[in-house]
Amino acid sequence: MGTRFLLALCLVLLVLGFEVQGAQLPQQDEPPSPALLSRVQESLSSYWESAKAAAQKLYEKTYLPAVDEKLRDLYSKSTAAMSTYTGIFTDQVLSVLKGEE
């Protein structure tokens, strides 16, 4: 569960990073220093890698199969309840928007 979440989070951040990199900004009078940007990017990357490694170590150290099973069960029950309530809410909104006929 944790590894998949971290992988998904990394992929989302990677896509967002490419979107930010790919955005074309209009020319400015004074372009930003590429050295500063690369240092900031390297610094953020190293912080991210160390935080990811620390989170992975903490997860592996505190992993309990019983707790993991309870969390999976809680997640499945809560998502089932939320989908039910979302359906009810959607039905109510549609009936209000549609009006009485």
From Swiss-Prot:
GO molecular-function term, one example from the UniProt record: lipase inhibitor activity
UniProt region (Lipoprotein lipase cofactor), positions on chain: 78-101
Modification note: Proapolipoprotein C-II is synthesized as a sialic acid containing glycoprotein which is subsequently desialylated prior to its proteolytic processing.
InterPro entries: Apo-CII (IPR008019), ApoC-II_dom_sf (IPR023121)
UniProt keyword annotations, A-Z: Chylomicron, Glycoprotein, HDL, LDL, Lipid degradation, Lipid metabolism, Lipid transport, Secreted, Sialic acid, Signal, Transport, VLDL
GO BP, sorted A to Z: cholesterol efflux; chylomicron remnant clearance; chylomicron remodeling; high-density lipoprotein particle clearance; lipid catabolic process; negative regulation of cholesterol transport; negative regulation of lipid metabolic process; negative regulation of receptor-mediated endocytosis
Location, primary (coarse class): secreted
GO-annotated cellular components: chylomicron; intermediate-density lipoprotein particle; low-density lipoprotein particle; spherical high-density lipoprotein particle; very-low-density lipoprotein particle
Leader sequence segment: 1-22
Region feature Lipid binding, mapped onto this chain: 66-74
Subcellular location: Secreted
Similarity comment text for this entry: Belongs to the apolipoprotein C2 family.
Summary of the function given for this chain in its UniProt record: Component of chylomicrons, very low-density lipoproteins (VLDL), low-density lipoproteins (LDL), and high-density lipoproteins (HDL) in plasma. Plays an important role in lipoprotein metabolism as an activator of lipoprotein lipase. Both proapolipoprotein C-II and apolipoprotein C-II can activate lipoprotein lipase.
PANTHER family attached to this UniProt entry: APOLIPOPROTEIN C-II (PTHR16566:SF0)
Protein name as annotated: Apolipoprotein C-II
Organism listed in the record: Macaca fascicularis
Organism phylogeny: Eukaryota, Metazoa, Chordata, Craniata, Vertebrata
